[in-house]
């Protein structure tokens, strides 16, 4: 993942918060229990936290309120501008992405919500390998994102979206890189992690991976 999604992110920046509040009927189920999902990621994190895809700063704010030290990475200039308006003045957000980033200090937890699907499965593997080198034993990756239990679950979800006339959602599901749990389990385990998957709505699972 380089900068190919930046235009999309910049366009989405000013409407993202309305999306997560369920104002777009096509994405209402995707963002169901949104606040609970963020809280779950926060509760599973500890120490110095590296956040990928800060977006408009919703997860970042909760992490800071919970007392975490947060290093935010966000590729979109528009997203960074909106997040800075919502977050403490002293908080800085660095330009970067899942594969290209700088880390100022040692990291205990790496977090992200609704973003890892921008990477292909091969890129996901490269990213997790990088994170494995960053984290000490006991360090964690906590990602919340749309993934599917298997191919059948994916196929049924796409078909259901089409039948409901949710063509934008169906197109999204077919053009982004929403992966399957067995693929992610293999990626994590091959890179030295023990991982669990917890489903928090029809689309979103929380992946909690601990470095062994």
From Swiss-Prot:
What are its E.C. numbers?
2.1.1.-
Keywords per UniProt:
Methyltransferase, S-adenosyl-L-methionine, Transferase
Q: What is its EC class?
A: transferase
The answer to whether UniProt assigns keyword Transferase to this entry is yes
Q: Which CDD domains match?
A: AdoMet_MTases
A GO molecular function term, named singly, is: S-adenosylmethionine-dependent methyltransferase activity
The record's disulfide annotation reads none
A Pfam family that this protein carries is Methyltransf_25
Asked if the record carries the keyword Methyltransferase, the reply is yes
Among the GO biological process terms of this entry, one is:
methylation
Residues recorded as binding S-adenosyl-L-methionine, renumbered to this chain, are 53, 74, 97
Q: Report the HAMAP family cross-referenced here.
A: Methyltr_YrrT
The similarity annotation says: Belongs to the methyltransferase superfamily. YrrT family.
Q: What does this protein do?
A: Could be a S-adenosyl-L-methionine-dependent methyltransferase.
Q: Could you identify this protein by its name?
A: Uncharacterized methyltransferase BCE_4457
């Amino acid at each position: 993942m380089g900068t190919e999604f930046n235009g999309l992110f910049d366009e989405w920046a000013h409407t993202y918060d309305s999306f997560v509040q369920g104002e777009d009927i096509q994405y209402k189920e995707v963002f169901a229990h949104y606040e609970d999902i963020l809280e779950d990621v926060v509760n599973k994190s500890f120490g110095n936290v590296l956040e990928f895809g800060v977006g408009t700063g919703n997860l970042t704010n909760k992490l800071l309120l919970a007392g975490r030290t947060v290093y935010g990475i966000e590729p979109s200039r528009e997203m960074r501008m909106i997040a800075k308006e919502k977050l403490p003045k002293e908080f800085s957000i660095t330009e970067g992405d899942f594969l290209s980033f700088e880390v100022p200090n040692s990291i205990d937890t790496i977090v992200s919500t609704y973003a890892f699907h921008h990477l292909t499965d091969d890129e996901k593997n490269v990213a997790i390998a990088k994170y494995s080198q960053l984290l000490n034993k006991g360090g964690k990756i906590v990602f919340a994102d749309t993934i599917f239990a298997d191919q059948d679950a994916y196929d049924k979800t796409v078909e259901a979206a089409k039948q409901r006339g949710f063509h934008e959602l169906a197109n999204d599901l077919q053009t982004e890189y929403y992966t399957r749990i067995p693929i992610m389990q293999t990626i994590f385990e091959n890179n030295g992690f023990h991982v669990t998957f917890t489903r928090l709505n029809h689309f979103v699972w929380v992946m909690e991976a601990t470095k062994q």
